[in-house]
Regions:
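Surface-exposed loop/turn positions
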Residues: 93, 152-154, 187
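Conserved beta-strand/loop positions that form the S-adenosyl-L-methionine
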Residues: 98
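A short glycine-rich, Lys/Arg-flanked "PGG" loop and its adjoining helix->strand segment in the class I
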Residues: 173-185
């Protein structure tokens, strides 16, 4: 986890690059560097679960901490276990990992019986990797904007880790509506957000912090949605007020996953 002082310096550098329209190339270069370091020090091609390990370059696109193969695997398992603990999983006949990337969480449904496993992502290379190496799952490409390539009420569970955290406010509203469409009545939508834990680490300017504390969504680098550069910070009340139309809010866990994201659990109304 980046310390507040270091984050402040990183934010200043990113802001400077953003003014020059160079922030996205800078982030990509940073990711390439992390991947190269991981590859240089060597790593296996298969994990302890017997499934292939995605290449370091793919993992760093999911998040810089995932250059570490162990963290990639352990955090994915933790999130899968977290999902199981939040919903009545024995009632889930079909689940969708929206924004599955290269299968960080998806891979941990390998041994599940009685549940059809689906995933989708905007990155075609990651989708191809999942379909080749995670044969128990059916993974499809989606665009940055809805719709998803699925029919109405197909899934009992849709979950999204580190997806809403990288979308503009407009896109978030559209995607919540789309997730509601593909859920069965009574189905659950579980997703992560950046909350008070991240704000408390001086991720925001004083003005941005005041806006967050007033209950407003704060989105940094909103012009780069769908990338790790774009970062959205959600007050808990904002989610209940603006993102739960047609849902009941049935669960909330602050700083609950290995990335210290807040976890929200919504249930679709009949």
């Amino acid at each position: 986890m980046i310390e507040p002082a270091r984050w402040g310096r990183r934010r200043a550098v990113l802001d400077a690059f953003d003014r020059l329209h160079l922030a996205r190339p800078a982030v990509r270069a940073y990711e390439y560097g992390l991947a190269a370091k991981s590859t240089l020090f060597g790593e296996g091609t298969r994990a302890d679960d017997g499934l292939p390990l995605p290449p370091a370059r793919m993992r760093t696109q999911v998040g810089p901490l995932h250059a570490d193969a162990r963290f990639f695997l352990e955090s994915g398992r933790h999130n899968a276990d977290l999902v199981r603990s939040l919903v009545p999983f024995d009632e889930v006949g079909a689940l969708l990992d929206w924004g599955c990337g290269c299968g960080r969480v998806l891979r941990h449904w390998s041994g599940v019986h009685g549940t059809h496993v689906y995933g989708c992502d905007i990155n075609t290379k990651m989708v191809d990797w999942c379909n080749e190496h995670l044969p128990f799952a059916d993974v499809a490409v989606n665009e940055l904007t809805p719709p998803l390539p699925y029919g109405d009420a197909e899934f009992d569970l849709v979950y999204a880790f580190s997806v809403m955290t990288h979308l503009s406010e407009e896109l978030q509203g559209a995607w919540v509506g789309e997730c509601r469409r593909v859920l069965t009545p009574g189905g659950h939508f579980v997703f992560s957000t950046l909350g008070e834990h991240y704000v408390s680490r001086d991720r925001l300017t004083p003005d941005e912090r005041r806006s967050f504390e007033a209950g407003n969504l704060v989105v940094l680098y909103e012009g780069s949605p769908g990338t790790s550069l774009c970062s959205a910070y959600h007050p808990r009340d904002y989610v209940a007020r603006e993102l739960a139309d047609g849902f009941d809010v049935v669960g909330f866990r602050p700083a609950a996953d290995d990335g210290r994201h807040d976890i929200h659990v919504l249930r679709k109304r009949p």
